[in-house]
Amino acid sequence: MKTSLFKSLYFQVLTAIAIGILLGHYYPELGAQMKPLGDAFVKLIKMVIAPVIFCTVVTGIAGMESMKAVGRTGAVALLYFEIVSTIALIIGLIIVNVVQPGSGMNVDPATLDAKAVAIYAEQAKDQGIVGFLMDIIPGSVIGAFASGNILQVLLFAVMFGFALHRLGSKGQLIFNVIESFSQVIFGIINMIMRLAPIGAFGAMAFTIGKYGVGTLVQLGQLIVCFYITCILFVVVVLGSIARAAGFSIFKFIRYIREELLIVLGTSSSESVLPRMLDKMEKLGCRKSVVGLVIPTGYSFNLDGTSIYLTMAAVFIAQATNSHMDIFHQVTLLVVLLLSSKGAAGVTGSGFIVLAATISAVGHLPVAGLALILGIDRFMSEARALTNLVGNGVATVVVAKWVKELDHKKLDDVLNNRAPDGKTHELSS
């Protein structure tokens, strides 16, 4: 049945974002005070992410007939992530070299306020590849759930799912309990999502109120260049991948439009992770595939963040007249292939990884980060939106690759067809 426009989450979030922009622009002090509304919504979502991932992965793996299928899915997913994220890095590098948004700024690094980025540089020290891999192993199971570390929870869930599968019929009771618990958690998520318009309003009002539209003008060329690059990446690269997998990228974007609007308001793709797990399963992807690909993609398949990292690093070089030849840019690319895997789908993580990369490369002035500190928040929306679409496409592609995709269901859902073959509006 067709949902009333005013009752649809899509309309409510879009309206809330518009009101937030107006409030932040005309009453900046009041707008800046709306920050707790956005923070509270994101915290509520984070509260249920760990149990959702655990339940989805455990029931998905334990319910599979063969454990080899799980290993094959994981290997295919990691291969896909590496290829596509590398393409994203290269595209960002090419575009920023062609457009050269930082050229002519002639900024002296000595005049920049290094203190403004000191906290990010300090956090970046822990972003080494060894530290990242060690951090995947939790100090305790309770600690993994308490901290909400996605990869730690995922590791424990995979091990738990394998162990439960080996129990066979003896583990059926535990399996049923976890599946029932999963339904309760998704019920909580439905309640939280009713607050999405309030969260989007608060986050957007704060952003405009604190940083102002004027901030966009000074470094607008980089922002415009980045947004256009992200759009081209989604339409051309992800669009081509989607076409090869047998579906339209535009129909897929329409299918996840509510999630995209929530991400637009909160600047965090993590805010819709629970909903994406549910929607990708409804799209025809097997639960075990969704449970592995989506959470893992939040650290290993951040296409938008990859584009941002190469563009921002070269922009700083251009603005500060720090010469970067082919050797330096290839070195930057290699470092980013590793450091970009440590970025999570939360606001601010991309900037921390950028600080880590610039420190590792050594050729660029760390103080140059101050140039984009003020506008980083405005670019986080494009990063998060691209990351979300990228992970959704990855799930369908991996499911198709390992033959765990219901093609008829995918076609019916994306074309708004009911099981009876009739075409009408389906609730999303």
UniProtKB/Swiss-Prot annotation:
Q: Which GO terms describe its molecular function?
A: fumarate transmembrane transporter activity; malate:proton symporter activity; succinate transmembrane transporter activity
Q: Which UniProt keywords apply?
A: Cell inner membrane, Cell membrane, Membrane, Symport, Transmembrane, Transmembrane helix, Transport
Alphabetized InterPro entries for the sequence? C4_dicarb_transport, Na-dicarboxylate_symporter, Na-dicarboxylate_symporter_CS, Na:dicarbo_symporter_sf
Q: Which domain of life is it from?
A: Bacteria
Where is the chain membrane-spanning?
Answer: 4-24, 44-64, 76-96, 142-162, 184-204, 222-242, 289-309, 326-346, 352-372
Q: Which family does it belong to?
A: Belongs to the dicarboxylate/amino acid:cation symporter (DAACS) (TC 2.A.23) family.
Q: NCBIfam families this protein is in?
A: PRK01663.1, PRK13027.1
PANTHER family noted in UniProt: AEROBIC C4-DICARBOXYLATE TRANSPORT PROTEIN (PTHR42865:SF1), PROTON/GLUTAMATE-ASPARTATE SYMPORTER (PTHR42865)
* Protein's recorded name: C4-dicarboxylate transport protein
What is the organism field in this record? Citrobacter koseri (strain ATCC BAA-895 / CDC 4225-83 / SGSC4696)
